[in-house]
């Protein structure tokens, strides 16, 4: 659920050297670091099954599932799986519309991509609710989400009927509903600073069998819901087709879908990774999956896919619009940095994340121009100044929700290109 503010430490009194914005006195810092190193030298890593060997990872199949439920954007074979699935979605869409009495060519489509951003996910929640109220919110053929965007995505995919639940998800929670801090000793012997059992319970409460069945029903209409994680062993971004998982109706589908939403939000070292059991041939392995933000803060589909050309191979010519909800600002947040190691590192990481997100927008914009897709972007405006005292600050989230709701309800004027970093010579 990370964003450019993830260098803020939710529990500074417990972990002064963890995710840092303020460093302890030098002597205390040295003492803590020394103790940490001593403890770490005597600690064994948590047990796990072997990772998929290098060179075989593209062939791994999630235990109990079919091969084609996920895509690797840089692997030609897995990209072809996406192309095949997209063509299948066109067949399903055409068949569904024909049953509804539609004749002629397929109608224009809208796609929605929701970025990461931690508790800034309240922006997407408010915007979608306001968009419903305004009256022009489309039904999206494709919805994608990363990190907190992955948590928003199922609600957005299923439409206005789930607006109330989405609002509750992002305006009635606080940090205690997301994670529990661990003791220093537990941190040293475990795989993360925090226990995210509260978030798991929250996802379990909201993503139930009824929701999965509703998602499966949309698969039959040719719609797609995708979320992103990162396979940390292979250093590979992975795109998961939640609609296909739901429509398979296989045992374990619901648990896998929940696990993927948790994995997409699992900030490395802050929240535990999600271990996914896979198989290659008759051998069993385990993949370690973490926050999709590690590779990209927002995505639409593999850049290697020329969507317009793919559709035209089966005679489909249609208008396409892409809407991006960026759960973050575009302008950098100014701050005077203390001349100390940890604040410098924190600000540098924050800056890196900020510009990675902007780079993602440029990548997507380039693809939309190539594939003749209308680009539309919404983001948190620089005028939003509500204090952000801690992660998942309920007051902050409600204020952001209300702002986004108002923006959309009034009829938002979408930004048609990424921020200009180099002034035009024209």
Predicted regions and their residues:
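Sec-dependent signal peptide recognition
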Residues: 26-33
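N-terminal secretory signal peptides that target proteins for export/translocation
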Residues: 1-25
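C-terminal motif of bacterial Sec signal peptides marking the signal peptidase cleavage site
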Residues: 39-42
């Amino acid at each position: 659920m990370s964003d450019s503010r993830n260098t803020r430490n939710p529990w500074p009194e417990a972990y002064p050297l963890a995710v840092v914005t303020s460093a302890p006195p030098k002597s205390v810092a040295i003492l803590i670091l020394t103790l940490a190193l001593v403890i770490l030298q005597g600690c064994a890593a948590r047990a796990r099954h072997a990772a998929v060997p290098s060179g075989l990872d593209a062939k791994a199949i999630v235990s109990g599932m079919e091969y084609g439920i996920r895509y690797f954007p840089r692997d030609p074979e897995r990209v072809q799986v996406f192309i095949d699935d997209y063509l299948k979605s066109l067949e399903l869409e055409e068949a569904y519309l024909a049953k509804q009495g539609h004749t002629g060519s397929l109608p224009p489509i809208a796609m929605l991509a929701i970025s990461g951003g931690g508790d800034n996910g309240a922006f997407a929640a408010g915007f979608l609710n306001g968009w419903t109220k305004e009256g022009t919110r489309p039904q999206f053929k494709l919805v994608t989400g990363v990190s907190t965007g992955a948590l928003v995505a199922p609600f957005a995919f299923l439409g206005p009927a789930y607006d109330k639940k989405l609002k509750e998800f992002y305006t009635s929670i606080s940090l205690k509903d997301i994670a529990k801090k661990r003791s220093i000793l537990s941190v040293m012997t475990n795989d993360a600073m925090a226990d995210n059992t509260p978030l798991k319970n929250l996802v379990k409460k909201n993503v139930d069998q009824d929701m999965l069945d509703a998602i499966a029903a949309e698969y039959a209409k040719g719609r797609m819901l995708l979320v992103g994680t990162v396979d940390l062993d292979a250093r590979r971004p992975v795109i998961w087709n939640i609609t296909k998982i739901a429509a398979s109706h296989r045992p374990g589908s619901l648990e896998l879908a929940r696990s993927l939403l948790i994995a997409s939000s699992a900030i490395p070292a802050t929240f535990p990774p999600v271990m996914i059991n896979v198989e290659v041939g008759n051998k069993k392995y385990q993949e370690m999956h973490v926050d999709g933000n590690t590779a990209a803060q927002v995505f639409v589909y593999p850049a290697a896919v020329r969507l317009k050309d793919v559709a035209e191979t089966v005679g489909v010519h249609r208008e396409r619009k892409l809407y991006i909800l960026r759960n973050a600002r575009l302008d950098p947040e100014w701050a005077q940095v203390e001349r100390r190691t940890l604040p410098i590192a924190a600000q540098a990481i924050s800056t890196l994340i900020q510009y990675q997100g902007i780079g993602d927008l440029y990548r997507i914009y380039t693809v939309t121009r190539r594939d003749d897709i209308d680009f539309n972007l919404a983001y948190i405006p620089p005028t939003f100044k509500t204090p952000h005292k801690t992660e998942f600050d309920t007051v902050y989230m409600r204020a952001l929700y209300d702002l986004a709701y108002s923006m959309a309800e009034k009829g938002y004027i979408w930004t048609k290109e990424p921020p200009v970093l180099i002034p035009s010579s024209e």
